Regions:
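Glycine-rich (often Gly-Gly/Gly-Pro-rich) flexible segments and glycine-rich loop motifs
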Residues: 183, 441-505, 599-647
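NTP-handling and nucleic-acid-processing catalytic cores
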Residues: 8-20, 68, 139-371, 471-492, ...
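Long, charged, mostly alpha-helical binding arms that flank functional sites
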Residues: 6-10, 233-238, 371-374, 379-411, ...
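N-terminal catalytic cores of NTP/NDP-binding nucleotidyl/phosphoryl-transfer enzymes
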Residues: 32-101, 130-145, 255-256, 322-358, ...
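Residue patterns forming the tRNA-binding/recognition surfaces of aminoacyl-tRNA synthetases
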Residues: 4, 9, 17-18, 22-26, ...
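Conserved oxyanion/phosphate-binding beta-strand-loop segments in alpha/beta enzyme cores
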Residues: 2-44, 73-82, 105-116, 217, ...
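Conserved phosphate/anionic-ligand binding catalytic regions in large, soluble enzymes, centered on
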Residues: 251-273, 430, 436-443, 509-524, ...
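Helix-rich, typically C-terminal accessory recognition domains appended to large enzymatic cores
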Residues: 86, 147, 151-165, 421-450, ...
Length: 886
C-alpha cells in the first residue's frame, strides 16, 4: 500500500485534457448508422445560442445529457449525441451596433470559443455532426424545405396587424409577447399592419392536440398542459348577427355558450375589424378612429390579458339578436382581437363576469336568461351568474336545463340558417417574417408580371450579403443598395416571365429563428461535416432520419413548452407529409431540467432601484449552518444585503463563471456538483461549499484507489458468490450488488443522478482497506469507478486504466448485479415478549409459516427468555420481527 506522500496527486488540469485528446483521437463518440435501432439511443440537449460563454445553466443541461449518453454507451447502445449552434438571431446584430463587429464574424468567433469550453468539459459529442444554423449548407437546405412547404400550401402571405417590438424594430410571434412586452428585450409591443409570411400550423391543430396523448408518460405533465392550453380547442356555435341598416353585412360570433343567446344586450367587435369601415356612421367616425389608434399601441396579448383594463367605444351601429329580433348596440372593445376567433363577441352581462363589468361601466342592460335551479326569473343585481341552471326568458327553451339548451339552441340556429356548430382553436398560424439581417432569407421574389413568386430551387441558396450596414433602425436588407436586385453571380436579378426574362426584387424579410430549431434534430441524423456533401446533399436522408428519430431523450428548459417544442412537433409532421420522414413526433421523452439558482447580493439605491453585486465583489461570512452573518462589499467595506435565491442571470449578477471553476477544481467536480444535489427536473441552488464538497469526494475516491493500487494490481477482483465470504467481506459484497441495483434503478427510471451519486458515496464509505480482503476491496473500488463513469468520466477513466485495464469504461460496460446476493442468507429478528425485546436471533430467510414459528420457539435464546412460560400467541413478520404473548 502506498503512503499518502507517495500517492499520485489528483490533478484534473492534467488528467482531463489528456483523456479528452484520447477520446477525440479514437473517435470514440462518433456513431454508425448500421446498428439495429433497438440498440441505438439518441440523446440531445437543446442546442445553444453562441453568446460567447457557457453559463452554469448550460453546464447543468449538458452534464445531464452527457451522463445519460455515457451511461447508455456502457449499457451497450450506439449513442448519437450531437452538438450544434442556434446561431441566427438578434444578439449578433446588437454586437454589430455596439462593437462594430460583423454578425458573422462575431457569431463564429463565439462558436469557436464555446466549442473549446464544451470540449474542456469533456462532453462526449459526435463532433462530425456539428453545424451552425447560419452555415450556408444548413441555411440552403432550410430554404429548400421552405419551398416544399410552399408547394404543399403550408405557406402564405397576408397583410395583417402584427406584434411590433419597439425595441427590436421587428415582428414577434404571439408566443414571443409576454405581458405586452417583447420576450427578449422587455420593451413595449404595439400593433402594426404589415405584409407577413405565415406557416399554416393551424392545419395540424387537431393532430398536435391528439399527439399529446401519445407523449403522456414521456413528457412532463406541465408541458403537455401548456400545449393543450395554447392549442385551445373549443366546441361551440357560430351565430350570425345581421347589422341594422346594412342588409349586406353579417357579423358572425363564436360562443361556447349558445344557451345565453337570449340574454345578449350588446355585441363587441375588434377595433381593427374590416367591417367597421362600412357600418360606422359619420357621427361616430372620429370617436371610433381615435379609439382604434389608442388600441393599436398595445399588443394583442396585452389586450386579451386578464389584468388589462377593459375599454369600449360605441360605434353608433346596431345588430339584430337572431333569437329575439331585438336591436343591440355594437361596441368596439380593446379586448377583442380581429384574428382571434371571428373578431366579434356577443356579450351577455348576466352570465359573464367580463361582460357584466363592461355593462356596469358603460350603463348597458343586464338580462338574466339562466336561473339557478329552484329560482325564478328576475334581476339578480349582485353580479353575473355563470353556473349551469334552468333556462328562463328564452322562449321555447324555458325550463330546459342550460347544458341541454346549448345543443337545442344550436340545432335551432342551424335549422333557421342563423348559425352552426363549430370547433375553434386558440392556436394561430405562425408568422415567420422578421425585419432583420442575421436570419435565413425568405426565398421569394417580386416582379411586375409574376408578382410574388418563389425562387427556383436551382437558384438556391439565397445568401446574405456581407457588406451590410446595421444601425438598429429598420431592415438592413431592405436598405442595402444592391442585394435585393442582384443574382448570386453578381448579375441583375431576373426571373422568367411570360414574355421572357424580367427584372425582379428579392423578399427582404428573413425567417423567424425558431425555424432553424424546428428541424435541426432531424438534420443531425444525416449530417457529416467531414464530407463534401455534408452527409447528404438533400435537406434530409429519410432512411437515416427514420433510423434515429424520434429522439429518445431531449433535455431542455420548460420555458420552451409553447415555442420551440410546439413548432418542432408541427415541423416534424409537415416533414413527414413532405416525404422526408415517416416519424410524426420528434421527441419520445422530454426532460426539463431545473434552473441553477443563487442568492442575490444588492444595495437599495436612493431611487428605490437595486444595485446588484457579483459574488466575487462581496465578502460573505456564514455560521456553521450556512446562514449569512455578514456581507460587505470588498470595494468600500460597506454592508450589502443578501436577497432571495433566484435563477442565475447577468442582470442580477448572481452568476458564476464555469471556466473559473474548471480551472480551479476541474470539469468532473463541476459535473458532479450540478448532478448530485437534487433530481434533474428540480432547481439546484449554487453553493461554493457544495462544490468544495464534490471536489473532496473525488479526491477521497482518488486517494482510496491510488493508495491501494500497488497492493491490488496483482489480485483479481472478487467475482464469486457472497455466500463464500464472511464478516466485513460478505457485508461489502452485498453492498456492491445493492449499490449497482440502486444506481441502475435510479438511472433507468428517472435519470436520478443524485440518487446514484449518493449510493456511490455510501459504497465508498464502506471500502475500508484495513477491514477487507484485497479481492473484495478491488471489486468494490472497480465497481465504484464504473458507476461514477457517466458522471465524472475523466477521473473514472484514469483510475480504471490505473488498475491495469487496457479497454475504456465504454468497453468495460455497466456492472451487473445479482438480486440474490443483495440480501443476507439469514435474517435478523428482534424477539419481543410482552412488548419488550428479550432476544435477537438469526434464522434462514427460506423459513416461512409454521416452520419459521417452530424455529423461533426452538431457538436457545428464545427458550431461555421464555423461562418455561407457554406462548399464547405468536406474530411473526418474515425477515422483520417476532412478537410473542405469554
Amino acid at each position: 500500500m502506498s503512503s499518502p506522500a507517495e500517492i499520485i496527486e489528483y490533478t484534473p488540469a492534467v488528467i482531463e485534457p489528456a483523456w479528452q485528446a484520447r477520446w477525440d483521437a479514437a473517435g470514440l463518440h462518433e456513431v454508425r448508422d448500421d446498428v439495429p435501432r433497438e440498440k441505438c439511443y439518441y440523446v440531445l440537449e437543446m442546442f445553444p445560442y453562441p453568446s460567447g460563454k457557457l453559463h452554469m445553466g448550460h453546464v447543468r443541461n449538458y452534464s445531464i445529457g452527457d451522463a445519460v449518453a455515457r451511461y447508455k454507451r456502457m449499457r451497450g447502445f450506439q449513442v448519437l449525441h450531437p452538438m450544434g449552434w442556434d446561431s441566427f438571431g438578434l444578439p449578433a446584430e446588437q454586437a454589430a451596433i455596439e462593437r462594430g463587429a460583423h454578425p458573422r464574424t462575431w457569431t463564429y468567433e463565439n462558436i469557436a470559443h464555446m466549442r473549446g469550453q464544451l470540449q474542456r468539459m469533456g462532453f462526449s459529442y459526435a463532433w462530425s455532426r456539428e453545424f451552425a444554423c447560419s452555415d450556408p449548407g444548413y441555411a440552403a437546405r432550410e430554404q429548400d424545405i421552405f419551398l416544399d412547404l410552399v408547394e404543399r400550401g403550408l405557406v402564405y402571405r397576408k397583410s395583417s396587424l402584427v406584434n411590433w417590438s419597439t425595441g427590436l424594430n421587428c415582428v414577434l410571434a404571439n408566443e414571443q409577447v409576454v405581458d405586452g412586452k417583447c420576450w427578449r428585450t422587455g420593451t413595449p409591443v404595439i400593433q402594426k399592419e404589415l405584409p407577413q409570411w405565415c406557416l399554416r400550423i393551424t392545419s395540424y391543430a387537431d393532430e398536435l392536440l391528439k399527439g399529446l396523448d401519445q407523449l403522456q408518460g414521456g413528457w412532463p405533465d406541465a408541458v403537455l398542459a401548456q400545449q393543450r392550453n395554447w392549442l385551445g380547442r373549443s366546441e361551440g356555435a357560430e351565430i350570425d348577427f345581421a347589422v341594422d341598416g346594412h342588409p349586406d353585412v353579417v357579423l358572425t360570433v363564436f360562443t361556447t355558450r349558445p344557451d345565453t343567446l337570449f340574454g345578449v344586450t350588446f355585441v363587441s367587435i375588434a377595433p381593427e375589424h374590416a367591417a367597421l369601415e362600412r357600418i360606422v356612421p359619420a357621427s361616430h367616425r372620429a370617436q371610433v378612429d381615435a379609439f382604434k389608434a389608442e388600441v393599436r399601441a398595445t399588443s394583442a396579448q396585452e389586450r386579451m390579458g386578464d389584468t388589462a383594463e377593459k375599454k369600449g367605444c360605441p360605434t353608433g351601429a346596431f345588430v339584430i339578436n337572431p333569437a329575439t329580433g331585438a336591436k343591440v348596440p355594437l361596441y368596439a372593445a380593446n379586448f377583442v382581437v380581429a384574428d382571434y376567433g371571428t373578431g366579434v363577441v356577443m356579450a351577455v352581462p348576466a352570465h359573464d363576469d367580463r361582460d357584466f363589468a363592461f355593462a356596469q361601466k358603460y350603463g348597458l342592460p343586464v338580462v338574466e336568461v339562466i336561473a339557478p335551479a329552484g329560482e325564478g326569473r328576475g334581476e339578480r343585481g349582485e353580479g353575473s351568474y355563470t353556473d349551469p341552471g334552468v333556462m328562463t326568458g328564452s322562449g321555447q327553451f324555458d325550463g330546459m336545463p342550460s347544458e341541454q339548451a346549448k345543443g337545442a339552441i344550436t340545432a335551432w340556429l342551424e335549422s333557421s340558417k342563423k348559425g352552426r356548430k363549430v370547433v375553434t382553436w386558440r392556436l394561430r398560424d405562425w408568422g415567420i417574417s422578421r425585419q432583420r439581417y442575421w436570419g435565413n432569407p425568405i426565398p421569394f421574389t417580386y416582379s411586375d408580371t409574376l408578382g410574388i413568386a418563389p425562387v427556383r430551387k436551382q437558384d438556391l441558396p439565397v445568401a446574405l450579403p456581407m457588406d451590410v450596414a446595421i444601425d438598429g433602425k429598420g431592415n438592413p436588407l431592405e436598405k442595402h443598395p444592391t442585394w435585393a436586385v442582384t443574382a448570386n453571380d453578381g448579375s441583375p436579378l431576373m426571373v422568367k416571365g411570360p414574355a421572357g426574362p424580367e427584372k425582379a426584387r428579392r423578399e427582404t424579410d428573413t425567417m423567424d429563428t425558431f425555424m432553424e430549431s424546428s428541424w435541426y434534430f432531424a438534420r443531425f441524423t444525416c449530417h457529416d461535416n467531414r464530407r463534401d456533401d455534408l452527409g447528404c446533399a438533400a435537406p434530409l436522408d429519410k432512411a437515416r432520419v427514420d433510423h434515429w428519430l424520434p429522439v429518445d431523450l431531449y433535455v431542455g428548459g420548460i420555458e420552451h413548452a409553447v415555442l420551440h417544442l410546439l413548432y418542432a412537433r408541427f415541423f416534424t409532421k409537415a416533414l413527414s407529409d413532405l416525404g422526408y420522414t415517416g416519424v410524426r413526433e420528434p421527441f419520445k421523452r422530454l426532460l426539463c431540467q431545473g434552473m441553477v439558482c443563487m442568492e442575490t447580493l444588492y444595495r437599495e439605491g436612493a431611487d428605490g432601484k437595486k444595485q446588484y453585486f457579483y459574488p466575487d465583489e462581496v465578502e460573505v461570512e456564514r455560521d456553521a449552518k450556512g446562514r449569512v452573518t455578514s456581507a460587505v462589499a470588498k470595494a468600500d467595506g460597506q454592508p450589502v444585503l443578501v436577497g432571495r435565491v433566484e435563477k442565475m442571470s447577468k442582470s442580477k449578477r448572481n452568476t458564476v463563471d464555469p471556466q473559473a471553476l474548471v480551472d480551479l477544481y476541474g470539469a468532473d467536480t463541476c459535473r458532479l456538483f450540478v448532478l448530485s444535489n437534487v433530481p434533474p427536473e428540480l432547481d439546484v441552488v449554487w453553493s461554493e461549499d457544495g462544490v468544495k464538497g464534490s471536489h473532496r469526494f473525488l479526491k477521497r475516491v482518488w486517494v482510496l484507489a491510488q493508495g491501494q493500487r500497488e497492493r491490488l494490481l496483482g489480485v483479481p477482483a472478487f467475482a464469486g458468490h457472497v455466500r463464500d465470504l464472511t464478516g466485513a467481506d460478505q457485508a461489502v459484497g452485498r453492498k456492491i450488488h445493492a449499490t449497482i441495483k440502486r444506481c441502475t434503478d435510479a438511472l433507468e427510471k428517472d435519470f436520478a443522478f443524485n440518487t446514484a451519486i449518493a449510493a456511490c458515496m455510501e459504497l465508498s464509505n464502506e471500502l475500508d482497506p484495513a477491514a477487507l480482503s484485497p479481492a473484495v476491496l478491488r471489486a468494490g473500488i472497480e465497481t465504484l469507478i464504473r458507476l461514477l463513469g457517466p458522471m465524472v468520466p475523466h477521473l473514472a477513466e484514469e483510475l480504471w486504466a490505473a488498475y491495469g485495464h487496457a479497454e475504456g469504461l465504454t468497453a468495460a460496460g455497466w456492472p451487473a448485479y445479482d438480486p440474490a446476493q443483495i440480501e443476507a442468507d439469514e435474517a435478523d429478528y428482534p424477539v419481543q415478549i410482552q412488548g419488550k425485546v428479550r432476544a435477537k436471533i438469526s434464522l434462514p430467510r427460506t423459513l416461512t409459516g409454521p416452520a419459521l414459528e417452530a424455529a423461533v420457539l426452538a431457538h436457545p435464546e428464545v427458550v431461555a427468555a421464555l423461562a418455561g412460560k407457554p406462548v399464547k400467541k405468536a406474530i411473526i413478520v418474515p425477515g422483520k420481527i417476532v412478537n410473542l404473548d405469554v
